[in-house]
Amino acid sequence: MPKLIALISKKSSISEEDFKIYYERNHAPLIESLFPTLNGYTRTYLFESNLLSDTLPLESDGAQSQFNVITELTFKNEEDLNKFFERGTSQDVIEAIRKDEAKLLAGEKTIMYRID
């Protein structure tokens, strides 16, 4: 099953709570509506309040991650993944995503990986 992960940063002007609320109520439904070949779309939030570096024996300086959410996108097969990428080249899709992301994301920091 093909998978992509995106490491995403919020705008510094948005609180963690407001970011999560907006992402769940607006951004995630938008992405799901634009990309019908998604088989799964999960988010894991990396907020400072959840940081455990002080309680675990890690070699870490305890600094907050530059990312605020890890998004995982899964697809049933390669064909669905390819349809996702094809759909992502549509000007309407690009504009809808950029308009929404401008409200909450520091888009220049987003990194995406294929992880299967």
Residues covered by each model-derived region:
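Macromolecular interaction modules
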Residues: 1-116
